[in-house]
Amino acid sequence: MKYLRHRRPNATLILAIGAFTLLLFSLLVSPPTCKVQEQPPAIPEALAWPTPPTRPAPAPCHANTSMVTHPDFATQPQHVQNFLLYRHCRHFPLLQDVPPSKCAQPVFLLLVIKSSPSNYVRRELLRRTWGRERKVRGLQLRLLFLVGTASNPHEARKVNRLLELEAQTHGDILQWDFHDSFFNLTLKQVLFLQWQETRCANASFVLNGDDDVFAHTDNMVFYLQDHDPGRHLFVGQLIQNVGPIRAFWSKYYVPEVVTQNERYPPYCGGGGFLLSRFTAAALRRAAHVLDIFPIDDVFLGMCLELEGLKPASHSGIRTSGVRAPSQRLSSFDPCFYRDLLLVHRFLPYEMLLMWDALNQPNLTCGNQTQIY
C-alpha cells in the first residue's frame, strides 16, 4: 500500500504534464482565432529616417555692442537694432537636415523655398502641387524648405516639433537655430549657399522662391533645358534704378546706419528667380566676403555685382503678380498662367485651384491673351 500511495501522485503529475503538452502543441499547430499583436507596430519607414551624424555646434555668436554707441542706433526700430547687433553672425546650429538621398542622384532643378516656421499649410500644398518631387521630361526635381525658428519661445517649442515631424515624414526641411524674420531672409540665403556647397553642389539649376508663389515647374524645365548649368544664369523680374527706402514706416526701411549708398545694383525680385550651378557658386564666393544686407534680393544683386555678373529679366516670372488686360476678365484665369514660369503671390487655396485647372486635359484657351 505504501508503494501504491507513493506512485499515485507521480502518475497524476505525468497525466497533468501530458495534458499540458497536448494543449501547448495544439496551440502551436492551430492558428489563433484572432490576431494577437505580440509587439508594437513598426514605425513607418518615413518616420524611421536615421538621424544624421551630429556636428559640433557653432560657438554662440555674441552681440556687437559697439553698435550701441552709434549716434543713430537708439532711434532705430527694434528689428533694425537687432540686425545691427548680430549682423556679423553667420553660423548657426542646423536643427533639421535632409537625408543624403536628397541629392544622391543628379538633380536637374532644386526647388529651394523660403518658409516661415508656422506656414505648414503652404508647405503641404506645395508638396501636393507644383513642388512635388518627380521627374519632368526625365529630369529630377527635388524640394527643400528653408526655415528658422519662431521668436516666441512657447511658439518655438510647438513649431519646432511640427518641423521635426515634417522632416521625418518628408525629408525636405532645412531648419537653422536663428529667429525667422524678414530681416533674416538674407541669413537664410547665406546658410543655404554654405549648405549646398557640401550637400547638393551637383544640382544643375535652382529655383529660389517664397512659399506663396505659384511655379509652373514643367515650363521651367522646358526653359532650362536650353541652358548650360556651367554658365551664368540668373533670371527673374528685374528691378533696377532704385535705392534704399528711408521712410521709417516701410517694411523695406533701410537707414543710413546700415548703408550710406543711395543706389542698389540691379537685382531680381525675391519672390522667385532661377539660377544655374555656376551662378550659385559665384554667389557663395561673394556672400563670404560681403557684409550681410537686410534685404535678401538686393544682397544677391550685390553678390552678382561683386562677381562681375548681371541678373536678367524673364517675362514669364511675375513677382508682382498678373493683371488682366480688361476689368471684365479675371486675373485668376488659368489661361493667363499656362505659359508663365512663376507668379507671386497666391493664397493657399488659390494655389491648389490653379494647379488643378492647369492640369485639366480639357483646358482650352484659344489665342494667346496679353497680360500685364
From Swiss-Prot:
Name the pathway it acts in. Protein modification; protein glycosylation
Q: What is its EC number?
A: 2.4.1.149, 2.4.1.146
Q: Which residues are glycosylated?
A: 64, 184, 202, 362, 367
The UniProt entry lists membrane topology as: Single-pass type II membrane protein
Q: Does the keyword Membrane apply?
A: yes
Summed up, the tissue specificity of this protein is: Expressed in colon, jejunum, stomach, esophagus, placenta and trachea.
- Where in the cell? Golgi apparatus membrane
The record's principal subcellular location, in a coarse class, is: Golgi
Instruction: Provide GO CC annotations from the record.
Output: Golgi membrane; plasma membrane
Question: GO MF terms on file?
Answer: beta-1,3-galactosyl-O-glycosyl-glycoprotein beta-1,3-N-acetylglucosaminyltransferase activity; N-acetyl-beta-D-glucosaminide beta-(1,3)-galactosyltransferase activity; N-acetyllactosaminide beta-1,3-N-acetylglucosaminyltransferase activity
Q: Which UniProt keywords apply?
A: Glycoprotein, Glycosyltransferase, Golgi apparatus, Membrane, Signal-anchor, Transferase, Transmembrane, Transmembrane helix
- TM regions (residue ranges): 11-31
Cytoplasmic side of the membrane: what ranges? 1-10
What Gene3D superfamilies is this protein classified in? Answer: 3.90.550.50
Recorded catalytic reaction(s): these are: a 3-O-{beta-D-galactosyl-(1->3)-[N-acetyl-beta-D-glucosaminyl-(1->6)]-N-acetyl-alpha-D-galactosaminyl}-L-threonyl-[protein] + UDP-N-acetyl-alpha-D-glucosamine = 3-O-{beta-D-GlcNAc-(1->3)-beta-D-Gal-(1->3)-[beta-D-GlcNAc-(1->6)]-alpha-D-GalNAc}-L-threonyl-[protein] + UDP + H(+); 3-O-{beta-D-galactosyl-(1->3)-[N-acetyl-beta-D-glucosaminyl-(1->6)]-N-acetyl-alpha-D-galactosaminyl}-L-seryl-[protein] + UDP-N-acetyl-alpha-D-glucosamine = 3-O-{beta-D-GlcNAc-(1->3)-beta-D-Gal-(1->3)-[beta-D-GlcNAc-(1->6)]-alpha-D-GalNAc}-L-seryl-[protein] + UDP + H(+); a beta-D-galactosyl-(1->4)-N-acetyl-beta-D-glucosaminyl derivative + UDP-N-acetyl-alpha-D-glucosamine = an N-acetyl-beta-D-glucosaminyl-(1->3)-beta-D-galactosyl-(1->4)-N-acetyl-beta-D-glucosaminyl derivative + UDP + H(+)
- Provide the top EC class: transferase
Going by the entry's taxonomy, the superkingdom of the source organism is recorded as Eukaryota
Q: Name one GO biological process term.
A: keratan sulfate proteoglycan biosynthetic process
Which residues are on the Lumenal side of the membrane?
Answer: 32-372
Q: Please report a single Pfam family linked to this protein.
A: Galactosyl_T
Sequence similarity: Belongs to the glycosyltransferase 31 family.
Functional summary from the UniProt entry: Beta-1,3-N-acetylglucosaminyltransferase involved in the synthesis of poly-N-acetyllactosamine. Has activity for type 2 oligosaccharides. Also acts as a core1-1,3-N-acetylglucosaminyltransferase (Core1-beta3GlcNAcT) to form the 6-sulfo sialyl Lewis x on extended core1 O-glycans.
- List the protein's name: N-acetyllactosaminide beta-1,3-N-acetylglucosaminyltransferase 3
Origin species: Homo sapiens (Human)
Q: Lineage of the native species? A: Eukaryota, Metazoa, Chordata, Craniata, Vertebrata
